[in-house]
Amino acid sequence: MTSESSTPTGSTRALPASITRSSSSTLSTRPSASTPASTGSLTPSTSTASLVVSPPPARSPVVSTRATATTRPRLAAERPGSATTPCPCGDTDKQLAPCLQEGAGFVIRNAAVRLYMRFGRVWFWHCMLGLWGVGNLIW
């Protein structure tokens, strides 16, 4: 079965019967006896699987030893290379004075620091810790 429909240009064309009317193409379904009626909420789970609690994994003695070991910063004498790198400044105020008077050193938290410029970067020597550091020069 076909019916005619007009197009925007006024011509008519044949349409298949299944789309002539939207009400005739919509099928109604009846709930079957095996399909439960929907209430809009989730149905309780009917799984037969049982919950088994597994024991916690065994702790490795090596991992616990590492986790509980205390860490402290190395002293200057313990650091590699510290014996061959002399500190350009001293530990006392009198020893710090020459570093500060040269204009190349300054004090950060009561520790002398020497600055050096190389390759566009600032290198600094922390006298108290015996460490080198580097940073970018920002003007």
UniProtKB/Swiss-Prot annotation:
<comment type="function">
    <text>Involved in drought, heat, cold, and/or salt tolerance.</text>
</comment>
<feature type="modified residue" description="Phosphoserine">
    <location>
        <position position="60"/>
    </location>
</feature>
<feature type="compositionally biased region" description="Low complexity">
    <location>
        <begin position="14"/>
        <end position="53"/>
    </location>
</feature>
<feature type="compositionally biased region" description="Polar residues">
    <location>
        <begin position="1"/>
        <end position="12"/>
    </location>
</feature>
<keyword id="KW-0597">Phosphoprotein</keyword>
<protein>
    <recommendedName>
        <fullName>Stress-related protein 1</fullName>
    </recommendedName>
</protein>
<feature type="region of interest" description="Disordered">
    <location>
        <begin position="1"/>
        <end position="86"/>
    </location>
</feature>
<feature type="compositionally biased region" description="Low complexity">
    <location>
        <begin position="60"/>
        <end position="74"/>
    </location>
</feature>
